[in-house]
A protein has these predicted regions:
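Short beta-strand micro-motifs within the conserved protein kinase catalytic domain, predominantly
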Residues: 64-79
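Protein kinase glycine-rich loop
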Residues: 6-12, 17
């Protein structure tokens, strides 16, 4: 290999992320990278990410991909994707470790993410899984970080999303139209961005639920009612108006990334800010609330705490033939959920 694998810095549902150091004399790669690896037999999602990143090309607000390679380690053939190293971890790591961001930082990061989404949508792709865990902090110089969009494993060309309906992404970031089985369009990415802004500003999950709250009832409320994530009271009026534009229930009326870039809340802001770093290695589970201690039951090595799994694959096209009510029921377990811990939620892939 042209690089040497270092320590593990994260684990996801389908892959493990490690540090990677270029071998001496290798000038195609930067000295330090992140390598995302999984078994060749389980590499469909990771291959999709590589293909999408290759099609996207170079964008300052998208995590850079340096290519892919195969390796044989421990008697197992691995598929590896070499990526830009995010020295600051994810925005989910920051919120977990330090709480809410000040509004000036929320503005800057929101603008950076919007630039990335505007580019992605302009090229004709939809990310399908925008959330704090997938928004990464990369060094831009010695003292500041910039936010970049990562994890394109669920991303699709917009027209292909329309051809195959079904659930994609994380339930509690899903727009109402996605819960009813409609296509995950660029507008759904904007709804998810709004959820991310709420979490950055409040330091709490976008849907703040008490222990004992019925998950089925909440998801039906998102789908069929007029509910949207609660706007943090500490946000300025501009910030509240920005979120209103993100949370318009009609996807045809919801503002686009291009429109939001001109909103007073983010217009004219810088995209890099000083930030503390967490000393802990992050994980990248695919749970609805992104708690790092949760590992999906779809992970290569499921945890003993995994108590149940879905009856069927939620990405299956068969969902287009089921009713909206049945689709939403598939997002929850038969057990009464405990909203205070992540084990009450399951990943949607």
């Amino acid at each position: 290999m042209t690089w040497v694998r270092g320590g593990t810095i994260g684990r996801g549902s389908f892959a493990t992320v490690s540090l990677a150091v270029s071998r001496a004399g290798e000038d195609r790669f930067p000295p330090l990278m992140a390598v995302k690896s999984c078994g060749v037999e389980d590499s469909a999602t990771l291959r999709n990410e590589t293909q999408v990143l290759s099609r996207l090309g170079d964008c300052q607000e998208v995590l850079r991909c340096y290519g892919d390679e195969y390796s044989c380690e421990g008697g197992r053939e691995l598929y590896n994707v070499l990526l830009e190293y995010a020295a600051g971890g994810s925005l989910a790591d920051y919120v977990r470790d330090f709480g809410a961001l000040v509004e000036s930082d929320v503005k800057r990061y929101a603008r950076s993410i919007l630039r990335g989404l505007d580019y992605i949508h302009g090229v004709g792709f939809v990310h399908c899984d925008v959330k704090l865990q997938n928004l990464l902090l990369c060094s831009s110089n010695d003292s500041v970080f910039c936010a970049k969009i990562g994890d394109f494993g669920l991303a699709k060309k917009a027209e292909k999303v329309a051809e195959k309906k079904g659930f994609r992404g994380t339930p509690m970031y899903m727009a109402p139209e996605c819960l009813s089985g409609e296509e995950h369009s660029a507008a759904a990415d904007i709804w998810a961005l709004g959820c991310a802004v709420v979490e950055m500003a409040s330091g709490k999950p976008a849907w703040q639920c008490q222990p004992g709250t019925d998950a089925n009832a909440l998801l039906f409320r998102i789908w069929g009612g007029k509910a949207s994530p609660e706007t943090p009271s500490e946000l300025s009026e501009e910030g509240k108006d920005f979120l209103e534009k993100c949370f318009l229930r009609d996807p045809r009326k919801r503002w686009t990334a291009e429109m939001l870039l001109d909103h007073p809340f983010v217009a004219g802001t810088d995209v890099t800010v000083p930030l503390k770093q967490s000393d802990e290695a992050s994980t990248s589970p695919r749970s609805p609330f992104d708690f790092p201690e949760w590992a999906s039951d779809h992970a290569p090595s499921p945890t003993p705490d995994s108590e149940a799994c879905f009856d069927r694959d939620l990405n299956s096209s068969s969902h287009s033939r089921t009713s909206p009510a049945d689709r939403i029921r598939q997002l929850v377990t038969d057990q009464t959920p405990n909203w205070s811990v992540s084990e009450s939620w399951f990943a949607v892939r």
